[in-house]
């Protein structure tokens, strides 16, 4: 991406002409895009069904006529049935893993990618034009190109390419949102722009007039895109598996950043509990790819190496079981796709079976050689279990071929049971039954274990009562999140012509430019300039011609002889004033206007068409009251508030009492010097 440097000509080219965002894919170009298109259609159908259900529930509460109530209840049952069908369709899209896998991956269990969140179109034109005219006192018609670039950039972000270029596109838009937040979104009021995003799992729309929802959703999509890239990596090569491990760690890192930065998100897919489960799932998939890399070229038929592979497989099983446990806790269980939790459970059993299989072939096929390091092998066995089988020691297992074989067959029997459990779980889910690759892999590994068991089966095996203990998981790989590099490559601020962001932001309101002709007197204009980008007038001689023309101390010079100088340094402006060679020159100046604090508009997040209203934060800037004498009112969470107002009409946006007694600094947004700050009072 390009650096955020001052261009020589701010009007030179539109960003679209510089290939700034030509990285989005057409909605019908790829199978993945077709799935995303189907998701958008389903989201609209879910929204319609939820509105119908909300209307029916309102009518049910409003009427006492038994006949009408019976008709409404019948209609409500049809609506709920249709809504359930639509959500099952959405779940089917979420588990359409074949589209995301590499074309040559016919011997790997499919990985689970995250789907991109869908959004509705947003028209920035009217609101931004009004704000430019009102706040910056500039002709908004001169920013048509910038507005068009912004709209095109957002549209391109809806279908990013599944590669690093697509990630760069989303990151660049996220950085632009940081600029936009500081230029156009004052903390004291809403400017009339409503952002709507659909929940990735439930399809429920969430609307909010705050840019923080946009930023959080883009972060979620960056993580989703990383997960899709990781899923697409070629897992038949070492390089492909290493790339998959790194990419899944990056995806988990973005979600972790989202979880820590936006702590009160309005949709279920970005709630802390759900994000925690998704992070665990992505790291489990990274661990899975690491294990596949470890056994890619085959496992050396060596005692300690095989036991090490067994413990690595046990670790993969363990992390997937942890993910399964998280996915079966409320409220995650109600929102995560059922097929996802079953897939995770299948993987947990599958890798548990692999761990027992590796131990089994190690014990059964092992032959003691004089060159073997017995101490090392004995240590490996002692670290394999928390407690040794009854009556056995590590040395006994090494020395006694019969006991070693019996223990190996016990592990083999345990592997077969785990394979059968994995197959049973996969057949219980209709969606997983249709994934042919998964069924073939599970069946092949099951048959391999059965074949190995049959080779060592004897008629009196039913007398062997030895039970294989659980394998202690152990790994040399630590699956950790990789923090996102969201500010690594600075992008060009689309609205940089408004001026440097440190000065021309929502924090300062500017007067309209004032034209004046200043004249030298005794070779001097009668004032001093300071600062850079833009320069400020100080030490103004009240008797000089410039003061007579209306120049005031503290004014900022934005134009000299018709040339924009908002981005010019003091020396550059001085050169512009002197280079004309004339005693008089025309300049334009602006001054900061007093900020009039008014009561901030209350901002509510709500689910369109739903009876519940999810209110987040009410901002206030009431300076007339003494905050020391006010009592703090407990602020309700956005979920509890919706339940409290069940009896109110669906069309009413319910807002909690404003938080009193807080310092003024806690009630407004903070805008640090970094224009890409993701801090937001709403989140």
Curated annotation (Swiss-Prot):
Superkingdom of origin: Eukaryota
Domain BRO1: 110-501
Main subcellular location of this protein, as a coarse class: cytoplasm
PROSITE patterns: BRO1, PDZ, REM_1
Domain PDZ: 515-592
SMART domains, per the entry: BRO1 (SM01041), Hr1 (SM00742), PDZ (SM00228)
Gene3D superfamilies from the UniProt entry: 2.30.42.10, alix/aip1 like domains (1.25.40.280), HR1 repeat (1.10.287.160)
Domain REM-1: 25-99
One annotated Gene Ontology cellular component of this protein: perinuclear region of cytoplasm
InterPro entries, alphabetized: BRO1_dom, BRO1_sf, HR1_rho-bd, HR1_rpt_sf, PDZ, PDZ_sf, RHPN1_2, RHPN2_BRO1
Localization of this protein: Cytoplasm, Perinuclear region
GO BP of this protein: negative regulation of stress fiber assembly; signal transduction
SUPFAM superfamilies, sorted: HR1 repeat (SSF46585), PDZ domain-like (SSF50156)
CDD domains: BRO1_Rhophilin_2, PDZ_rhophilin-like
Keywords: Coiled coil, Cytoplasm
Family designation: Belongs to the RHPN family.
Subunit relationships: Interacts with RhoA.
Function: Binds specifically to GTP-Rho.
Protein's recorded name: Rhophilin-2-B
Species per Swiss-Prot/TrEMBL record: Xenopus laevis
Taxon lineage: Eukaryota, Metazoa, Chordata, Craniata, Vertebrata
Gene that encodes the chain: rhpn2-b
């Amino acid at each position: 991406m390009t650096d955020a440097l001052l261009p020589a000509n701010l009007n030179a080219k539109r960003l679209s002409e510089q290939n700034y965002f030509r990285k989005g894919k057409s909605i019908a170009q790829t199978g993945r895009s077709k799935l995303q298109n189907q998701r958008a259609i389903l989201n609209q159908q879910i929204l319609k069904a939820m509105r119908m259900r909300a209307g029916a529930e309102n009518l049910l509460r409003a009427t006492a006529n038994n006949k009408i109530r019976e008709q409404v209840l019948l209609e409500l049952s049809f609506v709920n049935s249709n809504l359930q069908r639509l959500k099952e369709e959405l779940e089917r899209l979420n588990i359409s893993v074949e589209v995301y896998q590499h074309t040559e991956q016919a011997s790997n269990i499919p990985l689970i990618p995250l789907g991109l969140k869908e959004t509705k179109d947003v028209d920035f034109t009217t609101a931004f034009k009004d704000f430019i005219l009102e706040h910056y006192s500039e002709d908004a018609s001169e920013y048509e190109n910038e507005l068009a670039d912004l709209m095109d950039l957002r549209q391109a972000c809806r279908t990013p390419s599944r590669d690093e270029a697509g990630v760069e596109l989303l990151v660049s838009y996220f950085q632009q949102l940081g600029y936009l937040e500081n230029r156009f979104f004052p903390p004291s009021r809403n400017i009339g722009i409503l952002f709507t995003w659909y929940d990735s799992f439930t399809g429920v729309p969430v609307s909010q007039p705050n840019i923080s929802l946009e930023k959080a959703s883009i972060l979620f999509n960056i993580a989703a895109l990383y997960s899709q890239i990781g899923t697409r990596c070629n897992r038949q090569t070492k390089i492909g598996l290493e790339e998959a491990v790194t990419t899944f760690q990056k995806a988990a890192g973005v979600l972790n950043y989202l979880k820590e930065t936006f702590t009160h998100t309005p949709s279920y897919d970005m709630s802390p509990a759900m994000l925690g489960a998704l992070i665990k799932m992505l790291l489990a998939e990274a661990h899975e790819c690491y294990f596949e890399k470890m056994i890619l070229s085959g496992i050396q038929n060596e005692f300690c190496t095989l036991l090490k592979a067994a413990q690595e497989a046990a670790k993969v099983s363990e992390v997937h079981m942890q993910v399964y446990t998280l996915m079966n806790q409320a409220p995650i269980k109600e929102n995560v796709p059922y097929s996802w939790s079953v897939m995770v459970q299948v993987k947990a059993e599958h890798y548990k079976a692999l761990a027992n299989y590796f131990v089994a072939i190690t014990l059964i096929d092992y032959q003691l050689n004089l060159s073997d390091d017995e101490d090392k092998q004995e240590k490996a066995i002692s670290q394999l279990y928390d407690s040794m089988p009854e009556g056995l020691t590590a040395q006994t297992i090494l020395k006694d071929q019969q006991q070693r074989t019996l223990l190996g067959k016990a592990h083999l029997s345990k592997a077969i049971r785990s394979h059968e459990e994995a197959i049973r779980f996969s057949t219980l889910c209709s969606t997983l039954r249709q994934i042919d690759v998964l069924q073939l892999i599970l069946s092949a590994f099951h048959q391999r274990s059965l074949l190995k068991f049959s080779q060592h089966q004897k008629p009196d095996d039913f007398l062997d009562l030895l039970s294989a203990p659980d394998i202690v998981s152990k790994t040399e790989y630590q699956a950790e999140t990789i923090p996102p590099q969201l500010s690594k490559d600075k992008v060009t601020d689309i609205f940089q012509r408004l001026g440097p962001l440190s000065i021309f932001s929502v924090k300062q309101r500017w007067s309209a430019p004032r034209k004046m002709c200043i004249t030298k007197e005794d070779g001097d204009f009668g004032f001093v300039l300071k600062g850079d980008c833009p320069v400020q007038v100080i030490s103004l001689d009240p008797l000089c011609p410039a003061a007579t023309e209306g120049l005031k101390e503290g004014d900022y010079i934005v134009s000299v002889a018709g040339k924009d100088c908002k981005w010019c340094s003091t020396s550059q402006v001085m050169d512009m004033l002197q280079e004309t060679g004339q005693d008089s020159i025309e300049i334009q100046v602006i001054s900061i206007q007093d900020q009039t604090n008014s009561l901030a508009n209350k901002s509510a997040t709500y689910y369109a068409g739903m009876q519940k209203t999810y209110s987040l934060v009410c901002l206030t800037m009431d300076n007339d009251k003494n905050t020391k004498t006010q009592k703090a009112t407990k602020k309700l969470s956005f979920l509890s508030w919706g339940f409290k107002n069940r009896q109110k009409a669906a069309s009413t946006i319910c807002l909690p009492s404003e938080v009193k007694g807080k310092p003024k600094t806690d009630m407004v947004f903070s805008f640090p010097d970094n224009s890409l700050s993701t801090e937001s009072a709403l989140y």
